[in-house]
Amino acid sequence: MQPDIAPNPHSTRPGLSRRFSVAPMMDWTDHHCRYFMRLLSSQALLYTEMVTTGALLHGDRERFLRHDETEHPLALQLGGSTAAGLAACARLAEAAGYDEVNLNVGCPSDRVQNNMIGACLMAHPQLVADCVKAMRDAVGIPVTVKHRIGINGRDSYAELCDFVGTVHDAGCQSFTVHARIAILEGLSPKENRDIPPLRYDVVAQLKTDFPELEIVLNGGIKTLEQCSEHLQTFDGVMLGREAYHNPYLLAQVDQQLFGSVAPVISRHAALESMRPYIAAHIASGGNMHHVTRHMLGLGLGFPGARRFRQLLSVDIHKAENPLLLLDQAAKFLEGH
């Protein structure tokens, strides 16, 4: 089932599909990262870093909403828990051209918990439902939710069903489920991505019990072969850290998961395709490392990978002409 996906008939953008997506990741999925990832896959749904309602309503709005037209299909992830604030931000997202707005109900960080953002909201399903309804009433683009299978103290399957059912009653049709509970005290966000065990079986049961909903699986997925297996059960898969650290995995997403017959871009061609973008960023006063830090994984597993990473990170800061370093790094990928 693919609810809420019809593209604007007057748009040349690819239609929004959640069959494969790259997770919102703080400090990682900025607009430079997304531009690079889009070069590798035309079909993957990309997400922004989480933006809080306070930051968007009272901060540098242009910076938080900035994106390139090539990044579509593109979703804005919001963090917040007030219906009015989330509705206002959803309107801003729609006006800025985003294809979807997603509510974060999965982040376990202490910093966001203190502001009633993220996974702690799983303890308040009706509040989440009220927020979703307000957002849906405010915009015409899809409103989705990303959440865990539970939190400590509220981690039974019955409570998960209560959460999903309540939020579904508010109109949400698509749920991206990180197949771990979140432990809200005593673990860092990084530990919360590793220590709680993965429970794909729980998410599969959720899909069985809510067949009318779009259920996207997130957590621990590392290969496109695993994606294909999970897509026999779930409507979509979302990759996080693996897609960032090994970005060339995205180069075969269109062919393996969407049936594209287009040729797969080479690692070398991907890096070369970024050169004009990087040159423009430098010309506008930016630092090349803002962009190339997201590209270090292109050399993963290659002889000289360490030198490749060094050229695009450490050496940049002392280079008079950083584009020469980019060209040196490209030589490591020639023929690949």
UniProtKB/Swiss-Prot annotation:
The keyword Membrane does not apply. The keyword Cytoplasm does not apply. One of its GO terms (molecular function) is flavin adenine dinucleotide binding. Pfam families: Dus. The active site is at residue 107. Its EC number is 1.3.1.-, 1.3.1.91. Its cofactor is FMN. Keywords: Flavoprotein, FMN, NADP, Oxidoreductase, RNA-binding, tRNA processing, tRNA-binding. NCBIfam families: PRK11815.1, yjbN. Catalyzes the synthesis of 5,6-dihydrouridine (D), a modified base found in the D-loop of most tRNAs, via the reduction of the C5-C6 double bond in target uridines. Specifically modifies U20 and U20a in tRNAs. This is tRNA-dihydrouridine(20/20a) synthase. It comes from Pseudomonas syringae pv. tomato (strain ATCC BAA-871 / DC3000). The lineage of its organism: Bacteria, Pseudomonadati, Pseudomonadota, Gammaproteobacteria, Pseudomonadales. The gene is dusA.
